[in-house]
Amino acid sequence: MFALYSRALFFWLILFELIAGWRRWWGLSWLGPKLPRALLLPSLVGLRGRHVSMSGWLASLALALPPALLLQIAAGSLRNPRLTPLLRLRPGHYQQYTIERLDIPMREGHLPALHVVPRAGASAVVCVVHGSGCDKTSYAWRLVDTLVERGLALLLIDLDGHGENPRTQSFPAITENAEVAVTWLRARYGRVALLGVSLGGCVAARAVADGVVVDALAVLEAPPLLHYTQADVYREAIALVRPYLLDIFNDCTAQALIKAWEYPPIRAAISTWDLIAALDVSGSLAQIDTPLLLIYGASDAIVKPTQAAQVWAALPAHAAFHLVSGASHLTLILTPQVLQIVGQWLETTLITPPQRQTSH
């Protein structure tokens, strides 16, 4: 029985490895990209054995599937310890862009930031404001790649109370982060946009409503209020199981993903719940006349579609609104459809209009 179970376990490991190589999910591969996988096929065919009944083989496969999946994930992480996209968000020179670490002066303290510039340079820039409990690099690599490919620079900042920012999360001082970032960027770029995710969207919208001048504002999954239960948290975790998210393992291991979720506690003089209520994203958005993009996830268990509808009802007529099917709170910023919408809208808003005006 143990021998049959072991063969079933190896069957799954070989099958998973073949799939990982075919899909280029190197973060789930224990063989790596250079070794030939065709050599595994004969073993896969012969593992059942001649004298094993089909029912016994299927039962062994069912028992071996869960541990085999865990072993595959763990082996991929051990085999590829440096396969993490966060390495591409460190200061330095890369094939497509350069990254400079900044401490932008503020009235009190400073604003830590990463300045990402395409190799060919850029005339327009997007300041990215992260969500609660995150930092400037949180799941930002796909967004960085998307915008750099479209000729846009980025400024990734740490909000008060988060990451390397020495200041405490408080209201209304947190909106100074967006103000200082935009002022710094205005001195260097012709067109400037703000993009805020969740809490960052609330901060960005309030800053613009209070007078910060930008050429475009994109707000992703910003809550009018926080109302969720532990059951909603479980629903959000289940929503992580999305087929399109498996492609994240092209350049990331499971261990790297888990580490990307590890953040120190927020240093706060006001709770995130009270801060979001004070920022009043719906009231802020209603006052904004700059080009405006709103995106929410239809499977978001934290900012539910009913709350997205509340925000949509308050939007000015010129705003673009998208409710993306299948996207949850944690997966929205990684969703290819969302990245396509954001990238195309920002490119059109920040780069295309001036070119069209000069050609007519």
Please give the residue ranges for each predicted region.
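Catalytic histidine-centered segment of alpha/beta-hydrolase-like enzymes
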Residues: 327-337
